[in-house]
Amino acid sequence: MMGIQERKKREKERRRQQIMIAAKRVFSTKGFNKATMEDIAKEAELSPGTLYLYFKNKDELFSSLSIRILQYLNIRLGHVADNRKRLTVDQKIEALREAMHDVYKFDPLMLINMFHLQSSETLKNLSSDLIADIKKLSRNSLTIIARLFDEEIHNGAVIDKPAMVLADIIWSMFSGIVLWEESKKMIEGDKDFLEKTLDTAFDIFRRGIKTKLLKKTL
């Protein structure tokens, strides 16, 4: 009996992954607004009805793809946190910049979509479980970043401001630059200044949050 149940579970997960792979292709070529569940079903070689057994609507399918980028972000930030004891303030901020740029390179489209998702009405159309997952992953990312700053605030290396506020600023800076650089491509073609802009932004942030004592070493 357990063997049958296990096979059914694996088959369900395989079908779910099949749908998500097809959805990513369709969203990449048509964009979210023009893509339909019928387009995705055709790409996955499944009936539209089958898709609705796994995802209640297009918004939920789109958001499920975006969760993957949040999961990867959590993993990369976790790597920074694991090494925090042997990193200086400068090295921590540089490690954060590298982690975030790495997440962008991992899947630019899904990262951009995720940032749009978090600032849109789409969240209202998602299941409570999916919303909970998105909130949990986002909160975990911010908590990891805040803890990195909290340690430096306590030892006097960073200005005495709430660590979560500094984490929010880092997150806002990252998402804002990604979205702005993407919009600039519509005007300036395929020129990509994201890495250079991100470098400059993190450098300004780093200089701004360090205490006067440490600034003398700049």
Model-derived features with residue positions:
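Amphipathic, non-transmembrane alpha-helical scaffold segments
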Residues: 12, 20, 62, 66, ...
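Short coil/turn segments at alpha/beta junctions that flank glycine-rich nucleotide-binding fingerprints
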Residues: 29-33, 107, 155-156
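Generic hydrophobic, amphipathic alpha-helix propensity
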Residues: 15-24, 40, 65-77, 145
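C-terminal peripheral helix-coil segments that are non-catalytic and often amphipathic
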Residues: 1-3, 99-102, 139, 143, ...
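Membrane-interface starts of transmembrane alpha-helices
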Residues: 159, 163-167
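Hydrophobic alpha-helical connector segments
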Residues: 64, 68, 79-109, 166-170, ...
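Helix-turn-helix
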Residues: 18, 22, 26-64
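Short secondary-structure transition hinges
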Residues: 105-143
